[in-house]
Amino acid sequence: MPTMSRPALDVKGGTSPVKENANPEMNSLAYSNLGVKDRKAVAILHYPGVASNGTKASGAPTSSSGSPSPISSSTATPPTKPPPFNLHPAPHLLASMQLQKLNSQYHGMAAATPGQPGEAEPLPNWGFGAQAGGAGSLSPSAGAQSPAIIDSDPVDEEVLMSLVVELGLDRANELPELWLGQNEFDFTADFPSGS
């Protein structure tokens, strides 16, 4: 099969002949079951992971019966699978992410309303790297408030209880400090009365 050329657009919008199928013998042997258009597509773009119709390919071209071509199957390498992405991270990671989000929202509210009594200046916006103590963490400026202010911040009860449930701490009876402010008689309304 002779080398085919077709007009192609160059960068300036003009046309120039482009040579395709530089090795027609190899293309016709390795992809003997493909039509001329398919050979061009394989010669131009060869992605072993996904076939042209969106289905997963095995890395070796398949014949019409679905079996790999004998010529190219010995030279094809199987595609490597990327490590699976964990959609369900560990509970402690979810809890720390939730606390970080709340912390940044709380600092954002404090910065938006600096005129409140007891707040001399807006709190610094600490990034995730600073909380993790990474090497590239930024230290607060000399005039910034001390990090001890976080200890006096009120915690939203809904958020705290959602974290308790998420971590499974609601099933632990030996943590009475989590139930501060709740009376033991509050729980009697939850139980059905004997009738």
Swiss-Prot record:
Post-translation changes: Phosphorylated. Phosphorylation changes in a cell cycle-dependent manner and reduces its transcriptional cofactor activity.
Keywords, alphabetical: Activator, Apoptosis, Cytoplasm, Developmental protein, Differentiation, Nucleus, Phosphoprotein, Transcription, Transcription regulation
Compositionally skewed regions (Low complexity) per UniProt: 54-78, 137-148
Keyword flag Nucleus: yes
Biased composition (Polar residues): 97-106
Places the protein is found: Nucleus; Cytoplasm
Region annotation Disordered: where it falls in the sequence: 1-24, 51-149
Gene Ontology MF term list: chromatin binding; protein homodimerization activity; transcription coactivator activity
Keyword Amino-acid biosynthesis (UniProt): no
Chief location category: nucleus
Single biological process term from Gene Ontology: branching involved in ureteric bud morphogenesis
Any GO CC annotation of this UniProt entry: nucleus
Segments carrying motif Nuclear export signal: 160-169
Family affiliation: Belongs to the CITED family.
Function according to Swiss-Prot or TrEMBL: Transcriptional coactivator of the p300/CBP-mediated transcription complex. Enhances SMAD-mediated transcription by strengthening the functional link between the DNA-binding SMAD transcription factors and the p300/CBP transcription coactivator complex. Stimulates estrogen-dependent transactivation activity mediated by estrogen receptors signaling; stabilizes the interaction of estrogen receptor ESR1 and histone acetyltransferase EP300. Positively regulates TGF-beta signaling through its association with the SMAD/p300/CBP-mediated transcriptional coactivator complex.
Quaternary state and interactors: Interacts (via C-terminus) with CREBBP. Interacts with EGR2. Homodimer. Binds to RBM14. Interacts (via N-terminus) with HSPA8; the interaction suppresses the association of CITED1 with p300/CBP and SMAD-mediated transcription transactivation. Interacts (via C-terminus) with TOX3 (via HGM box); the interaction increases estrogen-response element (ERE)-dependent transcription and protection against cell death. Interacts with ESR1; the interaction occurs in a estrogen-dependent manner. Interacts (unphosphorylated form preferentially and via C-terminus) with EP300.
Protein name according to UniProt: Cbp/p300-interacting transactivator 1
